[in-house]
Amino acid sequence: MATSEELKQLRCDCTYRSKLAEQAERYDEMADAMRTLVEQCVNNDKDELTVEERNLLSVAYKNAVGARRASWRIISSVEQKEMSKANVHNKNVAATYRKKVEEELNNICQDILNLLTKKLIPNTSESESKVFYYKMKGDYYRYISEFSCDEGKKEASNCAQEAYQKATDIAENELPSTHPIRLGLALNYSVFFYEILNQPHQACEMAKRAFDDAITEFDNVSEDSYKDSTLIMQLLRDNLTLWTSDLQGDQTEEKSKDEGLE
């Protein structure tokens, strides 16, 4: 059993290693460092992550998954083109490669979901952190649903919606409408409605409500939150423009914007 001093040193070392890995753009190793920190150091609500640690965790997994999500989209597109050309051999090669990326994606998503479910969510008492972690849980189940099929897709989608809704219930009661975490949640939850559930009207309604609520209270936005809040509000507005255009029958190849790295 490690002493409190040893755990404190481990926490500092993991944070430093994570920052080094981020500077070197080695995001898998950044995630490894933050996983070690969470597994070894978060055992009750007195041990919960600082804002800096929480953000390092988020950046690590977001980038590790983001690169593979982009790869998956490219490979899937190539696979579809080979299929349309009836090139069975190349289509099969692309499919095998796609499945390899899907396995990597699934492993990373399950890794962070395990940390969220067993360590982070049970051991936090702060409303802001609860919203942050439930939003993350929704995001990573959403990513799983992007590449899953049939029952796997349905199960991941249900888990994502449940997590997003829990985050929303807390955020709407505990966080101001201009808070960047609440805005980011509305952004990603609305993308989930649009991209995964194929419910564009609900997506537009959610994004518009979040944007309008924030505009109403924008004079009260804190100086610390101003930059992040305005950026997310712009993404909400961009999506609303795109989705409204789609609903009016103007087809576009442009993809919805969320806080994930595309």
Swiss-Prot record:
Q: Which UniProt keywords apply?
A: Cell membrane, Cytoplasm, Membrane, Nucleus
Q: Which GO terms describe its cellular component?
A: cytoplasm; extrinsic component of plasma membrane; nucleus; protein-containing complex
GO MF term set: histone binding; histone reader activity; kinase binding
Membrane topology is: Peripheral membrane protein
Query: In which compartments does the protein localize?
Result: Cell membrane; Cytoplasm; Nucleus
Read off the InterPro entries from this record. 14-3-3, 14-3-3_CS, 14-3-3_dom_sf, 14-3-3_domain
Q: Name one Pfam family in it.
A: 14-3-3
Q: Which PROSITE patterns match?
A: 1433_1, 1433_2
Q: Which CDD domains match?
A: 14-3-3 (cd08774)
Task: Please provide the Gene Ontology terms (biological process) for this protein.
Answer: protein localization; signal transduction
What is this protein's function?
A: Adapter protein which binds to its partners, usually via a phosphoserine or phosphothreonine motif. Binding generally results in the modulation of the activity and/or cellular localization of the binding partner. Via its interaction with CDPK1 and PKAr, involved in merozoite microneme secretion and thus in merozoite invasion of host erythrocytes.
Q: According to its UniProt record, which protein family does this protein belong to?
A: Belongs to the 14-3-3 family.
What is said about its interaction partners and assembly? Answer: Homodimer. Forms a complex composed of CDPK1, PKA regulatory subunit PKAr and 14-3-3I; the complex is formed in merozoites in response to low extracellular level of K(+) and may play a role in microneme secretion. Interacts with CDPK1 (when phosphorylated) in a Ca(2+)-independent manner; the interaction does not regulate CDPK1 catalytic activity but is required for merozoite invasion of host erythrocytes. Interacts with PKA regulatory subunit PKAr (when phosphorylated) in a Ca(2+)-dependent manner.
What name does the UniProt record give this protein? 14-3-3 protein I
Recorded source organism is Plasmodium falciparum (isolate 3D7)
Encoding gene (name): 14-3-3I
